[in-house]
């Protein structure tokens, strides 16, 4: 048994006592034996002894006594075992010879390692794997198949699955096939197979980003909503919107007589008329005296040699029927005045109704503007003069009391 190791790191067992070896000296062993030959602790394994290739031995080598040969040769068991091992190590290329067979042989390793049973390996670079790469098929073998170089390959039982890559020539052919519209239907069916096939052919691309999924989700919900809205708006656009105040037909659309040249008509909506052209049409208001009359535009006329007309503070707007006419020497009311009074009493005139009636009156009144300019000697239309507060009217005379009563409401 070797002694304990010295403090200087040199072994206490002399290598010179190994006479059968004869190829190592003590000085040579001391020179080659250094402290860096001992590795640091690895886990829970303690490096307590060392046997070098050059024959240097130190540490606790008592466990080698059990393998020193026969049980009877106890005197040479440790050193003889080391000597034989060193001789075997020195011979290059000669495998070590088994000195003693173990009592119980170790069981053979399992064909499939439980640690790597579910692992996925990279393709093996051998001839069989290269042939499978060219074919481009994913095959699963029921039993482990041995390759040509002697290395056993892993099949389905080992849990190894190798996905082969296609050569560049086959990739270009697949791309041309994808661009062909005739194969588009086949490509969509192959993307989602209905049932698995025994040996399906898989096409592998360069990256995961090149995977194509052809999914048709149909028309979007937004397009459906827009279609329903367009259908609902179409009938609403065709239906006319009823007006708040439907226009009522005029009582007498056709005028009874053409207004003379000196007819004076006040039109509030027409701003281009001269200031002297004032329209004053009688309204069906009750008069306290036969010598006074009220007109729709707020002008009160007092009959006499010099009748004074003053506008009332409240204006009612243009309420002019299309059949109101009178001449210079006298007002001829007749049936037109009675019909207009009845129509006004029956309904209320709005501004839109007055504008419609005004549009029918304008062509008739337009012919009298020239004569009015000559009679009243007004300035040109470009000069806008203010409307006078009082107008002297001498041309209004009632025919008789009966006609005045017809105007009353």
UniProtKB/Swiss-Prot annotation:
Region (3 X 7 AA tandem repeats of [PT]-[AT]-A-[ENT]-[PT]-[PTS]-[AG]): 235-284
InterPro entries assigned: Cdc42_effect-like (IPR029273), Cdc42_Effector_BORG/CEP (IPR051296), CRIB_dom (IPR000095)
Name of a matching Pfam family: BORG_CEP
Bias kind Low complexity: ranges: 282-291
Compartment(s): Endomembrane system; Cytoplasm, Cytoskeleton
Annotated segments matching region Disordered: 1-29, 167-203, 237-260, 282-329
Sequence repeat copies, ranges: 235-241, 242-248, 255-261
Modified residues (Phosphoserine): 19, 27, 39, 65, 77, 101, 113, 121, 139, 191, 205, 207, 210, 312, 332, 368, 371
A biological process from GO: regulation of cell shape
GO cellular component: cytoplasm; cytoskeleton; endomembrane system; membrane
Biased composition (Basic and acidic residues): 167-189
Location of Omega-N-methylarginine modifications: 53
Record SMART domains: PBD
Phosphothreonine modified-residue sites: 34
Composition bias type Pro residues, residue spans: 243-258
Classification via PROSITE patterns: CRIB
Function: Probably involved in the organization of the actin cytoskeleton. Induced membrane extensions in fibroblasts.
Free-text comment on this protein's domains from its UniProt entry: The CRIB domain mediates interaction with CDC42.
Protein name: Cdc42 effector protein 1
Organism: Mus musculus
Higher taxonomy: Eukaryota, Metazoa, Chordata, Craniata, Vertebrata
């Amino acid at each position: 048994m070797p002694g304990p190791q010295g403090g200087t790191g040199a072994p206490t067992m002399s290598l010179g006592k190994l006479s059968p070896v004869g190829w190592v000296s003590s000085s040579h062993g001391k020179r080659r034996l250094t402290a860096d030959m001992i590795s640091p602790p690895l886990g829970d394994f303690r490096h307590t002894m060392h046997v070098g290739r050059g024959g240097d031995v130190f540490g606790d080598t008592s466990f080698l006594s059990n393998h020193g040969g026969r049980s009877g040769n106890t005197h040479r068991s440790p050193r003889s075992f080391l000597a034989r091992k060193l001789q075997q190590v020195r011979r290059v290329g000669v495998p070590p010879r088994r000195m003693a067979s173990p009592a119980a042989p170790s069981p053979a390793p399992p064909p499939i390692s439980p640690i790597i049973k579910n692992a996925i390996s990279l393709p093996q670079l051998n001839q069989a794997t290269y042939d499978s790469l060219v074919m481009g098929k994913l095959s699963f073998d029921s039993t482990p198949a041995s390759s040509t170089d002697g290395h056993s390959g892993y099949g389905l039982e080992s849990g190894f699955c190798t996905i082969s890559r296609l050569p560049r020539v086959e990739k270009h052919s697949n791309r041309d096939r994808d661009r062909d519209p005739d194969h588009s239907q086949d490509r969509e069916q192959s993307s989602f197979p209905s049932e698995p096939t025994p040996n399906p052919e898989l096409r592998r691309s360069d990256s995961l980003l090149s995977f194509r999924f052809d999914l048709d989700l149909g028309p979007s919900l937004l397009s459906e909503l827009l279609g329903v809205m367009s259908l609902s708006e179409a009938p609403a656009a065709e239906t006319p919107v009823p007006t708040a105040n439907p226009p009522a037909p005029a009582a007498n659309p056709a005028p009874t007589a053409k207004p003379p040249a000196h007819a004076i008509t006040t039109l509030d909506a027409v701003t281009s008329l001269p200031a002297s052209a004032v329209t004053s049409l009688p309204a069906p208001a009750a008069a306290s005296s036969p010598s006074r009359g009220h007109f729709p535009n707020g002008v009160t006329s007092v009959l006499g040699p010099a009748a004074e007309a003053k506008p009332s503070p409240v204006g009612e707007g243009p309420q002019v029927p299309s059949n109101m006419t009178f001449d210079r020497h006298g007002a001829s009311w007749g049936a037109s005045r009675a019909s207009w009074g009845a129509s006004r009493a029956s309904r209320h005139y709005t501004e839109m109704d007055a504008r419609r009636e005004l549009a029918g009156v304008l062509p008739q009144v337009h012919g009298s503007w020239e004569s009015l300019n000559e009679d009243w000697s007004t300035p040109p239309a470009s000069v806008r003069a203010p409307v006078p507060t009082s107008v002297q009217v001498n041309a209004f005379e009632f025919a008789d009391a009966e006609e005045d009563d017809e105007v009353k409401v």
